[in-house]
Curated annotation (Swiss-Prot):
InterPro entries: AIPM/Hcit_synth_CS (IPR002034), Aldolase_TIM (IPR013785), LeuA/HCS_post-cat (IPR054691), NifV/FrbC (IPR013477), PYR_CT (IPR000891). Pfam families: HCS_D2 (PF22617), HMGL-like (PF00682). This protein is a Fe-Mo-cofactor biosynthetic component. The lineage of its organism: Bacteria, Pseudomonadati, Pseudomonadota, Gammaproteobacteria, Pseudomonadales. GO terms for molecular function: homocitrate synthase activity. The keyword Transferase applies. This is Homocitrate synthase. It comes from the Bacteria. Disruption phenotype: Fixes nitrogen very poorly; has very slow diazotrophic growth on nitrogen-free agar plates. A double nifS-nifV deletion no longer fixes nitrogen. The gene is nifV. It comes from Azotobacter vinelandii.
C-alpha cells in the first residue's frame, strides 16, 4: 500500500463524545487547522441535527479549503435532503448491516436494506454528490451480506464502502482478515472506522490498511463516542514510521491542532498520551537518561523532531547520579561523587513525598546548601574522602 487517504471525523464523531459541543467558531477553526495540516477529507457534521448545524457546515464549505468535505447521513430521504443544502461534495450514507441492528434497531430485514441502498445512493448521485456507503456495525455482520451491500451501492454509483466497527469489538487479526476478504471481493474504495473500546482503534486501523483499506477515519486526540476513535496523530506517525506510508500530513503541526481540540472539547490530553501527551518524550530512569546522553537513538522510537518537540530529562525517584551531576552543572555547581550520591537520596525522598516529577532549581540549590552545611559524613566519621 503506497498511500492512504485520511478522512478525519473530529467534527462529527469526535463531537459525539458525551459532553463535547463545539461552537461555530471552534468548528471553523478546527476545519481550517485540519486542512492546513494536509488532511485530504473532513467529515464536518450531521445535517439532520438542525439549521444551526447546517449553517456551520455551509460556512465551512464556503472557506474554500483544499480538503474534500463530507456530511454524515442516515440512509434516509430526510437526511439526504438536509445534506444537499450544506455545500458538501460527498455524503456518507449510513445504515446498519448486522442482523442484530437491522432487526432490533430498525425492525427491518436485509432485502429492505438492499432496496434502500440502491434507491438512496442513486438519488444522491443524481443530486451530484459523491457517495460513501457507511456499513454500521459491520464488525458483527455477515461478511457476505456486507459484500452484497457494497455491490448494490457500487452499481448505484457509490465510490466507497465504510466498514464501521461501531461498538469497538474488532481486534487486529480479525480486521486484517476482513479487509483482505473485502478487497478481494469489491472493486471500490474501502474505508475503516474504528472505535477504541478495547484500546485497539489505531491497531485495527493499521491492520485494515495492511488488508487493503484505502481510507481511514481518524479524530484528533482520539476524541469520540464512548472510548473514542483512532487518533489522527497515532495513525499518521505509525503509518509513516512503522509501515513507510506517508499520508501527506505536516506532522510538525500536530501538537498545535491537538491543543486546539483539547481546548475546544474540554477534554484534557493525558500526560502519557502517545504522540501528543506532555510526557511522551520525558525521561527520568537513570539507565535511559545515560543511554540517551550517549546516543539518543538508544531510547528513541519516535523522533520528537517530527513533531517540533524535543526530549526532556528530569530528576526523580529513578534518576541516577550522572543526571544529578549534569543538572547541578547546569546550575553552575560542580559536585563531588559523595555529593551526587547524597543529593540523589534527597531528590528521591522529595519525589516520593511530593509526587512531583522534578524539583525546581531553587529547591535543588536549597538541597545543596543544606548538604554543604552538614559536610561530608565520611570525613566526619574519620573515613577517606
Amino acid at each position: 500500500m503506497a498511500s492512504v487517504i485520511i478522512d478525519d471525523t473530529t467534527l462529527r464523531d469526535g463531537e459525539q463524545s458525551a459532553g463535547v459541543a463545539f461552537n461555530a467558531d471552534e468548528k471553523i477553526a478546527i476545519a481550517r487547522a485540519l486542512a492546513e495540516l494536509g488532511v485530504p477529507e473532513l467529515e464536518i457534521g450531521i445535517p439532520s441535527m438542525g439549521e444551526e448545524e447546517r449553517e456551520v457546515m455551509h460556512a465551512i464549505a464556503g472557506l474554500g479549503l483544499s480538503s474534500r468535505l463530507l456530511a454524515w447521513c442516515r440512509l434516509c430521504d430526510v437526511d439526504l435532503a438536509a445534506a444537499r443544502s450544506t455545500g458538501v461534495t460527498m455524503v456518507d450514507l449510513s445504515l446498519p448491516v448486522s442482523d442484530l441492528m437491522l432487526h432490533h434497531k430498525l425492525n427491518r430485514d436485509r432485502d429492505w436494506a438492499l432496496r434502500e441502498v440502491a434507491r438512496l445512493v442513486g438519488e444522491a448521485r443524481m443530486a451530484g454528490l459523491e457517495v460513501c456507503l457507511g456499513c454500521e456495525d459491520a464488525s458483527r455482520a455477515d461478511l457476505e451480506f456486507v459484500v452484497q451491500v457494497g455491490e448494490v451501492a457500487q452499481a448505484a454509483g457509490a465510490r466507497r464502502l465504510r466498514f464501521a466497527d461501531t461498538v469497538g469489538v474488532m481486534e487486529p487479526f480479525g480486521m486484517l482478515d476482513r479487509f483482505r476478504f473485502l478487497s478481494r471481493r469489491l472493486d471500490m474504495e474501502l474505508e475503516v472506522h474504528a472505535h477504541d473500546d478495547f484500546g485497539l482503534a489505531t491497531a485495527n486501523t493499521l491492520a485494515a490498511v495492511m488488508g487493503g483499506a484505502t481510507h481511514i477515519n481518524t479524530t484528533v486526540n482520539g476524541l469520540g463516542e464512548r472510548a473514542g476513535n483512532a487518533a489522527l496523530e497515532e495513525c499518521v506517525l505509525a503509518l509513516k514510521n512503522l509501515h513507510g506510508i506517508d499520508t501527506g500530513i505536516d506532522t510538525r503541526g500536530i501538537p498545535a491542532i491537538s491543543a486546539l481540540v483539547e481546548r475546544a472539547s474540554g477534554r484534557q490530553v493525558a500526560w502519557q498520551k502517545s504522540v501528543v501527551g506532555a510526557g511522551v518524550f520525558t525521561h527520568e530512569a537513570g539507565i535511559h537518561v545515560d543511554g540517551l546522553l550517549k546516543h539518543r537513538r538508544n531510547y528513541e522510537g519516535l523522533n520528537p523532531d517530527e513533531l517540533g518537540r524535543s526530549h526532556s530529562l528530569v530528576l526523580g525517584k529513578h534518576s541516577g547520579a550522572h543526571m544529578v551531576r549534569n543538572t547541578y552543572r547546569d546550575l553552575g555547581i560542580e559536585l563531588a561523587d559523595w555529593q551526587s550520591q547524597a543529593l540523589l537520596g534527597r531528590i528521591r525522598a522529595f519525589s516520593t513525598r511530593t509526587k512531583r516529577r522534578s524539583p525546581q532549581p531553587a529547591e535543588l540549590q536549597d538541597f545543596y546548601r543544606q548538604l554543604c552545611e552538614q559536610g561530608n559524613p565520611e570525613l566526619a566519621a574519620g573515613g577517606m574522602a
